[in-house]
Swiss-Prot record:
Belongs to the eukaryotic ribosomal protein eL8 family. One of its GO terms (molecular function) is RNA binding. Keywords: RNA-binding. The keyword Membrane does not apply. This is RNA-binding protein CA_C3141. It comes from Clostridium acetobutylicum (strain ATCC 824 / DSM 792 / JCM 1419 / IAM 19013 / LMG 5710 / NBRC 13948 / NRRL B-527 / VKM B-1787 / 2291 / W).
Length: 79
């Protein structure tokens, strides 16, 4: 696992879904402890777009990977 995600990323559900739908996403990170419905929505869309998904154990850990001081449910590395 990487220590930090690259700078060209978006964090959060709305921005992640937007990036995937606009075909700007390269890779998707999802926290395993994110709300079930949210988790499934992002996972399904990422699979539909044939994107690589990386599962992170906790939202706190994903927040740290994103270099933010709060928890994050999803993040997308942009092309």
């Amino acid at each position: 696992m990487v220590n930090r995600l690259p700078k060209n990323k978006v964090v959060g559900m709305k921005q992640s879904l937007k990036a995937i739908n606009e075909k700007k996403a390269q890779m998707v990170y999802i926290a395993k402890d994110a709300e079930s419905e949210l988790f499934q929505t992002v996972e399904k869309l990422a699979n539909e777009h044939s994107l690589q998904i990386v599962y992170v154990d906790t939202m706190k850990e994903l927040g740290k990977l994103c270099n933010i001081d709060v928890e994050a449910s999803t993040a997308v590395v942009l092309k």
